[in-house]
Amino acid sequence: MCDDEEVTALVCDNGSGLVKAGFAGDDAPRAVFPSIVGRPRHQGVMVGMGQKDSYVGDEAQSKRGILTLKYPIEHGIITNWDDMEKIWHHTFYNELRVAPEEHPTLLTEAPLNPKANREKMTQIMFETFNVPAMYVAIQAVLSLYASGRTTGIVLDAGDGVTHNVPVYEGYALPHAIMRLDLAGRDLTDYLMKILTERGYSFVTTAEREIVRDIKEKLCYVALDFENEMATAASSSSLEKSYELPDGQVITIGNERFRCPETLFQPSFIGMESAGIHETAYNSIMKCDIDIRKDLYANNVLSGGTTMYPGIADRMQKEITALAPSTMKIKIIAPPERKYSVWIGGSILASLSTFQQMWITKQEYDEAGPSIVHRKCF
């Protein structure tokens, strides 16, 4: 960007589950921590223990036994602005150790987010943190940049929301975006439920984090769900054991693939929606007939909920079944896709051509928060 160390842009990808933050031009985020704010469940007994009234991120996670944990971002939308400010404050001052008033800041948001949401983000950045400039980018578009493409369809599945976003020459096609409020957190909840049927009880916010870990370590997507169920019923070859923090060992079998199967069959959790393979197909079908071929050949997976082993093969199989038989279909699953939104942001914010795109403090002062709709596409 420049030889000046001072003006590196900051990139902050605020996910429903994890905040990924760092400096533009880096190849990975410096700070990755849970988007959690925890408050003590009980009044502190011991005087002088210096108990804080709130904890953020990893500290909240490690003290989860005595805290009530809340996620300020639900389904990709910020629902609790006070907590969100705490998270940003923690990001700038404790994790990155920078003064936000010295750095342009790139934030990300989910496609089809309410307009008021990005206005409020803009307002807080300029008024609370006094950033010199900022920009709000759409997550899926950044993931596509990170994969080195400007055209393709992104399946972005995070902790709070899943989308299929067709992008052509760098622009998202809003009329064809499919949004599904079914993502990692719902899968964790579903796994909690089906483990209960096995006789293991997980209820508190702290225990939910244990189940999330089980999900991340042991779950996978079956290529053929019925076959896999039959295999699981007739042999114990698919069973795996997991040691809980208290030393108890639990065994998990068909739950390993029943949990992420929900992505393809949302009826498992009582949702009437189509699965991610169908929404991808529907999204492509809403696009102009001339660009469909390019979209089919560039299905890019992004986000933590696409990290399940077997998901790319299953998507390939399902979309091939829906698409015209002569169509070439390619699923791209970059190994770093957990962070591809952040990486795309890092690339974008360090491009020389992007520097005129920032919303400056001056522009904000003249036009107010609504400037974000004019400048950020």
From Swiss-Prot:
It catalyses: ATP + H2O = ADP + phosphate + H(+). The modification Tele-methylhistidine is found at residue 75. It is found in: Cytoplasm, Cytoskeleton. One of its GO terms (molecular function) is ATP binding. CDD domains: ASKHA_NBD_actin (cd10224). Its EC number is 3.6.4.-. Coiled coil: none annotated. InterPro entries: Actin, Actin/actin-like_CS, Actin_CS, ATPase_NBD. Oxidation of Met-46 and Met-49 by MICALs (MICAL1, MICAL2 or MICAL3) to form methionine sulfoxide promotes actin filament depolymerization. MICAL1 and MICAL2 produce the (R)-S-oxide form. The (R)-S-oxide form is reverted by MSRB1 and MSRB2, which promotes actin repolymerization. In vertebrates 3 main groups of actin isoforms, alpha, beta and gamma have been identified. The alpha actins are found in muscle tissues and are a major constituent of the contractile apparatus. The beta and gamma actins coexist in most cell types as components of the cytoskeleton and as mediators of internal cell motility. Belongs to the actin family. Polymerization of globular actin (G-actin) leads to a structural filament (F-actin) in the form of a two-stranded helix. Each actin can bind to 4 others. This is Actin, alpha skeletal muscle. It comes from Carassius auratus. The gene is acta1.
